[in-house]
């Protein structure tokens, strides 16, 4: 069962669904929900394969970045912002961007498989960076060039939004794992040096215990590298949600590593806790919602 279940359960129970914005950045099939489709050149289909070294045109990157910055400047200072993503192949673009920004991130980035395909991700990332004539572990690289070469549209939009909102003092919850670490790294690389401390103090990566405890990746070490690279204190927080006592096998499989994070699961679970509700109550709610979903006529249930 998709981790989107967690976000849906939280948003519905907390009455936040009307305040949720889904942004389509170029899906071949439009989301089956109310959403905002950005105009060209921001949304002109998916990015090309990162191995090409030409994932997006620079014009598209600049347009997405400026859109994010504009939204960040317009966001109310007294309203926290939660950013989530759903990007196919997103951990691969995350690794490629992190490498392009000069971080030794190989082996640290997670993935959707039970055991992340570190070798495959590294080969694709290195191939793309080489094709774009970008050095791995280089310092002083142009983050826009890295984004255009091996990034994805979400990263450009989210980095601009994180940069401007955080710099203005808006609390930003980067709901996710490796992909949101890459967004934070991009925001820090793009921001002027005198804004980075403020940015890092306001933007927090929020993930699940399943990802944080995964033996085949290391998000905490990834954040430590980001802290060292830009001389800030990158923040990571882990939600308490566990599914070990759920009735649904589909949810208990999270505890076995088959699902770890995605669609903002960790951030939404943390939002639930910040509202003063216990994590066990959210687990029970997800269990009931999962049972309803699996028994729905859409899936051939009763």
Placement of each model-derived feature along the sequence:
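N-terminal loops that bind phosphate or other acidic moieties
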Residues: 1-84, 88-302
């Amino acid at each position: 069962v998709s981790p989107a279940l967690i976000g849906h359960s939280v948003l519905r129970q907390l009455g936040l669904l009307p305040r949720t914005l889904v942004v389509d950045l170029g899906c071949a099939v439009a989301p089956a929900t109310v959403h905002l489709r950005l105009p060209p050149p921001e949304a002109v289909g998916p990015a090309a394969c990162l191995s090409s070294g030409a994932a997006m045109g620079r014009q598209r990157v600049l347009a997405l970045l400026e859109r994010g910055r504009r939204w960040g400047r317009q966001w109310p200072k007294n309203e926290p912002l939660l950013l989530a993503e759903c990007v196919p192949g997103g951990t691969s673009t995350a690794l490629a961007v992190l490498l392009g920004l000069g971080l030794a991130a190989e082996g640290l980035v997670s993935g959707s498989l039970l055991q992340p395909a570190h070798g495959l991700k590294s080969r694709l990332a290195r191939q793309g960076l080489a094709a774009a004539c970008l050095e791995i572990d280089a310092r002083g690289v142009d983050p826009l060039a890295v984004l255009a070469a091996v990034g994805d549209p979400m990263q450009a939009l989210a980095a601009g939004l994180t940069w401007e909102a955080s710099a203005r003092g808006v609390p930003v919850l980067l709901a996710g794992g490796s992909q949101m670490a890459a967004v934070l790294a991009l925001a820090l690389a793009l921001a002027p040096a005198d804004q980075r401390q403020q940015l890092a103090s306001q933007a927090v990566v929020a993930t699940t215990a399943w990802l944080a405890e995964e033996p085949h990746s290391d998000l905490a070490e990834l954040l430590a590298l980001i802290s060292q690279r830009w001389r800030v204190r990158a923040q990571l927080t882990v939600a308490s949600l566990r599914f070990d006592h759920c009735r649904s096998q589909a949810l208990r499989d999270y505890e076995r590593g088959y699902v770890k994070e995605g669609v903002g699961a960790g951030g939404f679970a943390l939002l639930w806790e910040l509202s003063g509700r216990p994590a066990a109550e959210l687990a029970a709610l997800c269990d009931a919602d999962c049972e309803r979903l699996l028994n729905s006529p859409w899936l051939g249930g009763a």
